[in-house]
Curated annotation (Swiss-Prot):
It comes from Halorhodospira halophila (strain DSM 244 / SL1) (Ectothiorhodospira halophila (strain DSM 244 / SL1)). NCBIfam families: hisG (TIGR00070). GO terms for cellular component: cytoplasm. HAMAP family: HisG_Short. This is ATP phosphoribosyltransferase. The gene is hisG. It catalyses: 1-(5-phospho-beta-D-ribosyl)-ATP + diphosphate = 5-phospho-alpha-D-ribose 1-diphosphate + ATP.
């Protein structure tokens, strides 16, 4: 019997938008991942299972062989880095923008801005590319709170509709990059199971194209 392929996914929007693509490939979870407490979920195919992990951990599980492939946002992949990853397909799901945001008038002039974000590497890279010095403050959530309590002048975060920013008196100021979710593959797994993984990669790419044209 062939080895089971493991696909790492995170709960939330990525999972919600990946499941229809898997269904187009003939892969259905054996139970609802959102309702289940299980972290490893079988599918209707004996050779494919799902691994439910935190979004920021998807590339780590794939890089270190805990999963053969996964779905992660471009933001997570760029922040993570890593040489053991191959990202052959932009699935075009969970689209949003990585933005600099803050008070509508911008940061106070004449001093180095304090920037709250969980994307420390990408934020530092963005400001350095503009020749701007910034103090980066690492947070894991509720970025919008930092300017409200005077802890930061700006935030770098993912923005979809912008409703949360507006509700907290903030505005998008600069777009760093558009974001969508990509299929990411363990390079070693691709060498040991090229036919099976290659077929699944091609099927998911075709499903993503079909979604865009439907």
């Amino acid at each position: 019997m062939s080895r089971t392929l493991t696909l790492a996914l995170s709960k939330g929007r990525i999972l919600e938008e990946t499941l229809p693509l898997l269904a187009r490939c003939g892969i259905e979870p054996a139970e609802d991942p959102d309702a289940s407490r299980k972290l490893i979920i079988g599918t209707n195919r004996e050779d494919v299972r799902l691994l439910v992990v935190r979004a920021s951990d998807v590339p780590t599980y794939v890089e270190h062989g805990g999963a053969d492939l996964g779905v992660a946002g471009r933001d997570v992949l760029l922040e993570h880095g890593g040489d053991g990853l191959y990202d052959p397909v932009d699935l075009g799901i969970a689209r949003c923008r990585l933005m600099v945001a803050g008070p509508p008038d911008g940061p106070p002039p004449g001093r180095r801005p304090r920037v709250a974000t969980k994307f420390v590497h990408l934020a530092r890279q963005h400001f350095a590319a503009q020749g701007r010095q910034a103090e980066i403050i690492k947070l894991y959530g509720s970025m919008e709170l930092a300017p409200l309590v005077g802890m930061a002048d700006l935030i770098v975060d993912l923005v979809d509709t912008g409703n949360t920013l507006r509700a907290n008196g903030l505005a998008p100021l600069e777009e760093i990059m558009p974001i969508s979710s990509r299929l990411v593959v363990n390079k070693a797994s691709l060498k040991t199971s090229p036919d099976r993984l290659g077929t699944l990669i091609d099927d998911l790419a075709a499903a993503a194209r079909a979604k865009d044209t439907s």
